[in-house]
């Protein structure tokens, strides 16, 4: 098989770089690049600067693992939240969706993925050791009384919830799962706030 050469010109490199975005193929990347250069060069410059700044400054919260520019994110630092209640989600986008329901007042842990052996994602890749440390040795000084599993209702999300749930239950930790108001195969990021709020309230 012939080796595919990387594009050498700036436009080709831009098109290739845009393809790292989910769902963006060669034609979509080309349209984006052409639009930015033809219609919005100032916007392209702002985009490039903002992306560079985010890559340099955005890390992970030391407590919940979500994206944060500070060691402890604003959610974890909020003293009004219930530190004895921990909600586990797959991604920062899922955390945002749960927050928008206004029905959860505890803290979070963001796995940054889900168990999927075919994709090379196991317990280590979803920061399971950090999660256990977070639960068994909470730095808030308040024991965690309930862990809410809010992974997606995909096969990988269910496998992740099952794995985490079994380990935590064996340690005597109360574990609940959000209710199935969310369709099988559904992802939290695309569920309306009302449905998600009901799923949280009906957890068991």
From Swiss-Prot:
GO terms for biological process: DNA recombination; DNA repair. It comes from the Bacteria. It holds the Pfam family RecR_HhH. Keywords: DNA damage, DNA recombination, DNA repair, Metal-binding, Zinc, Zinc-finger. May play a role in DNA repair. It seems to be involved in an RecBC-independent recombinational process of DNA repair. It may act with RecF and RecO. Belongs to the RecR family. HAMAP family: RecR (MF_00017). This is Recombination protein RecR. It comes from Polynucleobacter asymbioticus (strain DSM 18221 / CIP 109841 / QLW-P1DMWA-1).
